[in-house]
Amino acid sequence: MKIAVDAMGGDHAPKEIVLGVMKAVAQYKDVEILLFGDETKINEYLTDKTRVKIIHTDEKIESDDEPVRAVKRKKKASMVLAAQAVKDGEADACISAGNTGALMSTGLFVIGRIKGIDRPALAPTLPTVTGKGFVMLDLGANAEAKPEHLLQFGLMGSVYAEKVRKIDRPRVALLNIGTEETKGNDLTKKSFELMKNQDAYEFIGNIEARDLLMDVADVVVTDGFTGNMVLKSIEGTGAAFLSMLKMSLLNGFKNKVAASFLKKDLMALKAKMDYSEYGGACLFGVQAPVVKAHGSSNANGIFTTIRQVREMVEKQVVETIKAEVDKVKVGGTESND
């Protein structure tokens, strides 16, 4: 399989992107990489060109570019060319650690939306206390959503959890302010009713935010505005907790001695809370796998994302979503233009 990679997107591009690519092709003999970006800069780090092809371009989308305008004006940007390769059948999937909004726009405008899917959804896998993790969507592709959209999000998340995360009959929950069916606003109440009355996936009811990391569900569905705030809250809380723990352990001689014995365990805890270890955030609802690697990804983060995309292609996640979208009868009412 061929995977198109934006070599110029992310905080540590192109170095960490290239190092991650080399690690992936060394591990997976069935993977070929199309690297889009500045050939001179890429070659500074690309020491092994086995199954790696560079497609040179001087143009790239910056982190502060306005997404839609950048995609339309920068036709030769590395991110856009990577998506175009997928559109033209030259690659099976694409990856970028660059501008999230631009990648979503590229996925929609260049690769295109799946017929019958009303809205795309951005879905990372977030950590849980056991290290199993859960898929959450939408985390920012849509600020607003309708009940029909959340119904479809449940289907897409369930397919991914089953195919890639290898969970038999994934538990799908709806994020709400209480577990009772009557709780919530108009969106969550109507979404609950739709999800309860479908048989395309295993809906287990509402989940409260405090239980997200407790392995209660395998897939959690919400609108993009709420989801993005939850993501930032988890990131901020995790960082604050580790910072406070570090300050406590370094306060006084006895604590420092204890910290030296706990160092390995604390590093393991930090790794468990790092959701980039699960790969990137999938843009579900488009015609091919499009995955957003974390902007600060190192080589291992890029490797993990390539491994994730390889699994998506191999397990035919997009093809399964296309085949099963009709099971969610209420959706598919909006234009695919």
UniProtKB/Swiss-Prot annotation:
UniProt entry keywords in alphabetical sequence: Cytoplasm, Lipid biosynthesis, Lipid metabolism, Phospholipid biosynthesis, Phospholipid metabolism, Transferase
Catalysed reactions listed for this entry: a fatty acyl-[ACP] + phosphate = an acyl phosphate + holo-[ACP]
Pathway entry: Lipid metabolism; phospholipid metabolism
Enzyme Commission code: 2.3.1.274
Pfam families: FA_synthesis
Subcellular location: Cytoplasm
Signal peptide (from-to): none
An annotated GO BP: phospholipid biosynthetic process
GO molecular function: phosphate:acyl-[acyl carrier protein] acyltransferase activity
CC annotations in GO: cytoplasm
Superkingdom, taxonomy of origin: Bacteria
SUPFAM superfamilies to which the protein is assigned, alphabetical: Isocitrate/Isopropylmalate dehydrogenase-like
Function according to Swiss-Prot or TrEMBL: Catalyzes the reversible formation of acyl-phosphate (acyl-PO(4)) from acyl-[acyl-carrier-protein] (acyl-ACP). This enzyme utilizes acyl-ACP as fatty acyl donor, but not acyl-CoA.
Family: Belongs to the PlsX family.
Subunit structure: Homodimer. Probably interacts with PlsY.
Protein name: Phosphate acyltransferase
Organism: Listeria monocytogenes serovar 1/2a (strain ATCC BAA-679 / EGD-e)
Taxonomic lineage from the root: Bacteria, Bacillati, Bacillota, Bacilli, Bacillales
